[in-house]
């Protein structure tokens, strides 16, 4: 199975930091955000990844490309550990492809841009703003990996969800599963997805997270999806049509998630990853503890 990662967005929520730097290249400790999402794909067994980019996102393409000059310099200076870290950015058995989204026509259109490279096959979609904490779940078995396994077993498209406080439901797409309660790692049929409902009208508190596994049927539906909210082709509209056509399931994620397209969410992720960093975590945690005493 291939994965499509739309990275063509302008990152306006993170301005001014993203004026000249793609939001996906903002660093979380010592790696850019996009690296964590690609690593998640690789851990789940995905070997072919399609990045849907924009002309302003060359830094992303360069990050996953080979840098002969850098590698030669590190080799000459016997910086073996750094050399291995640079070479591991894109594992040898993983292919990362790029396709441009010429016009900003929405998330549905961005996903559709990946069709020529994916082909008429099932595929995963990963929204790079959303980070699933690698320290809170086994990425080789849970979440995306489990969604793919569930899809392979049932043929039902999977949409990742997580519970949010009822007072926050109006900020999310919310899954209507007919009142069925889910635990982590479980799936249930979706009747509909309601975009940003009022608290009174929300069918549940299961918010869509930003991880999808779609059957190939979604491709033709995306082609037929009319212009929707914001004069854009909305992925949600295509999902609504898919739900009418075949079974689509909500998959309850395991562990923690961070919205790194939001400044507070990004800062929270930085602290959480910082205190757990293999080399820097101990010193950083000590700093945080001392800082907390002064607040």
Curated annotation (Swiss-Prot):
Q: Which domain of life is it from?
A: Bacteria
Q: What is its EC number?
A: 2.7.7.9
GO BP annotations of the record are: biosynthetic process; UDP-alpha-D-glucose metabolic process
Signal peptide positions are: none
Q: What is this protein called?
A: UTP--glucose-1-phosphate uridylyltransferase
Q: What does this protein do?
A: May play a role in stationary phase survival.
Instruction: Quote the catalytic activity from the record.
Output: alpha-D-glucose 1-phosphate + UTP + H(+) = UDP-alpha-D-glucose + diphosphate
Key word Nucleotidyltransferase present in the record?
A: yes
The record's NCBIfam families line, in alphabetical order, gives: galU (TIGR01099)
Q: Per its UniProt record, what CDD domains does this chain match?
A: UGPase_prokaryotic
One Pfam family hit: NTP_transferase
User: Is this entry keyworded Protein transport?
Assistant: no
A single Gene Ontology molecular function, please? UTP:glucose-1-phosphate uridylyltransferase activity
Which protein family is it in? Belongs to the UDPGP type 2 family.
Organism per entry: Haemophilus influenzae (strain ATCC 51907 / DSM 11121 / KW20 / Rd)
């Amino acid at each position: 199975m291939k994965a499509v990662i739309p990275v063509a967005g302008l990152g306006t929520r993170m301005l001014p930091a993203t004026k000249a730097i793609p939001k996906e290249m903002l660093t979380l400790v010592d790696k850019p955000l996009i690296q964590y999402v690609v690593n998640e794909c690789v851990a789940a067994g995905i070997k072919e990844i399609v990045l849907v980019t924009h002309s302003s996102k060359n830094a992303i393409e360069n990050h996953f490309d080979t840098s002969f000059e850098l590698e030669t310099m590190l080799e000459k200076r016997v910086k073996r550990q750094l050399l291995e870290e640079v070479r591991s950015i894109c594992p040898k058995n993983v292919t990362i492809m790029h396709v441009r989204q010429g016009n900003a026509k929405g998330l549905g259109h961005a996903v559709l841009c990946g069709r020529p490279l994916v082909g008429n096959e099932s595929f995963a979609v990963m929204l790079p703003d959303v980070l699933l904490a690698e320290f809170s779940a086994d990425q080789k078995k849970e979440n995306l990996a489990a969604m793919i396994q569930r899809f392979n077993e049932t043929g039902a498209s999977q949409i990742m969800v997580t519970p949010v406080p009822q007072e926050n439901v109006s900020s999310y797409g919310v899954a209507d599963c007919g009142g069925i309660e889910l635990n982590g790692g479980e799936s249930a049929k979706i009747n509909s997805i309601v975009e940003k409902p009022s608290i009174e009208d929300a069918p549940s508190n299961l918010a869509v997270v930003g991880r999808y596994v779609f059957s190939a049927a979604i491709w033709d539906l995306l082609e037929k999806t009319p212009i929707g909210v914001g004069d854009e082709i909305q992925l949600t509209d295509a999902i609504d049509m898919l739900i009418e056509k075949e079974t689509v399931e909500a998959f309850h994620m395991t562990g923690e998630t961070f919205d790194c397209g939001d400044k507070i969410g990004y800062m929270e992720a930085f602290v959480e990853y910082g205190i757990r960093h293999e080399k820097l975590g101990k010193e950083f945690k000590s700093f945080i503890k001392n800082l907390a005493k002064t607040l």
